[in-house]
């Protein structure tokens, strides 16, 4: 059984892969590119061909099937937002809704999206007058910092405790998910509504075009 599997996506697949190799050389890195239609099948085949004691999902929206979950052991996901922001919109809603804080959430993965028990939360004050590109960079940096901390602590564990340690951490954590889940379609509807109600909203000029053109 391979100790670790890391499933991630661009744009953080390269730095995430380097961290994995630093702390767990020889572990399995799977990079899922949602822009490539065949990629999901490739990732699925690789997951079904192995078994892992501990699996990490990092900065990607890959949804694991029940069959895949059975091969992944204990699964941890680093969600690039606070528990109050479930689903998509983690790098846009805090700006649109003028949140005072942002953060990242480490949680166990189950068959639902962003419902697994929370292990820990990193929370930061929102900088003044921050714009979308800078905010996205901040969340990515904080996500990578949490990934490195996770790998450091896991490296210090005996092999037999790779999963049990993180499950026990989740049982002790008091943080809970809150708020409604926002899908990709829901985010598209929200952005279209914003462009109609406030066409001069500054974030509309900062967002990449593909977010604004997604079908509702």
Where does each model-flagged region fall?
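Donor/substrate-binding cores of folate-linked one-carbon enzymes
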Residues: 2-10, 19, 56-193
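Short, charged/polar "capping" segments at the starts of alpha-helices
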Residues: 12-16, 38-41
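C-terminal active-site/capping subdomain that shapes the small-molecule cofactor and substrate pocket
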Residues: 15, 188-216
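A short, Lys/Arg-enriched amphipathic alpha-helix followed by its capping loop at the start of a domain
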Residues: 15-27
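Short, flexible loop segments at the rims of nucleotide/cofactor-binding pockets, characterized by
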Residues: 31-35, 52-56, 82
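Short amphipathic alpha-helix with an adjacent loop that forms part of the alpha/beta core around
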Residues: 39-51
